[in-house]
Amino acid sequence: MPIKAVIFDLDGTITRPYFDFDAIREQMGLPRDSGPVLESMLKMAPAQRRRAERILHHHEREAVERSELNPGARQTLSALRRMGLRIGVLTRNTRANAVAIARKHDLRFDAIVDREDGPVKPDSFGVLHLCRQFGVEPGQTLLVGDYLFDLLCAKAAGAVAVLLSNNDRANEFAAHADFCIENISEILQIVEQSNRGSTV
């Protein structure tokens, strides 16, 4: 089945890894082993959650201001567009921050799904939503990310899971990936090989 769309995680995939989630948990008063921040916040009392949201928003805004693209990101996005593929972003961040990063780095995405649109990764919602918007099947879609939730999300939706190995935990996640890459530009080779001989 030909690849017709590529969905990217944002933080750590399009941009270089920045967030120190242990520091964020500490500021929120959470144990280091408390699990993902967003899920932990849902369990908080209202006043504690509001404080945690302010802390998270501060770190997210700082991440936008200091964001740098991963090597090859802009060139890869441009090449995918020339190949006629649809390009989406699926992030646990906010739409405002995703748009701010796109503007800062002069990037163009066909669609963005953020944490305010529905259930977040690893739920399959975002992938399925983008596939419907693009008019493609999940099996015609790559999901590229640097964390376990990206891969589980892809698998749950029936998309092709691609792990960008850019952190010291990548080996823990590799078993859940269909492809493992070290540079985002390797996506182009995956698309070309997948589409070679495929009928549209």
What are these model-derived regions, one by one?
Residues 1-4, 79-82, 99-200:
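Asp-based, Mg2+/Mn2+-dependent phosphohydrolase catalytic module
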Residues 1-50:
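Active-site neighborhood of HAD-like aspartate-dependent phosphohydrolases
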Residues 13, 20, 95, 149, ...:
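Conserved Rossmann-like nucleotide-cofactor binding loop
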Residues 16, 89-90, 145, 165:
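Small/polar loops that bind or transfer phosphate-bearing groups
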Residues 19-20, 72, 149, 186:
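Residue-level recognition of oxygen-bearing side chains
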Residues 24-25, 57-60, 98:
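Hydrophobic alpha-helical core bundles mediating ligand binding, dimerization, or RNAP-core interactions
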Residues 49-60, 107-112:
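Short, basic/glycine-rich phosphate-binding loops at helix/coil junctions
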Residues 62-89, 95-103, 124:
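Short, acidic loop-to-helix structural element flanking the phosphoryl-transfer center
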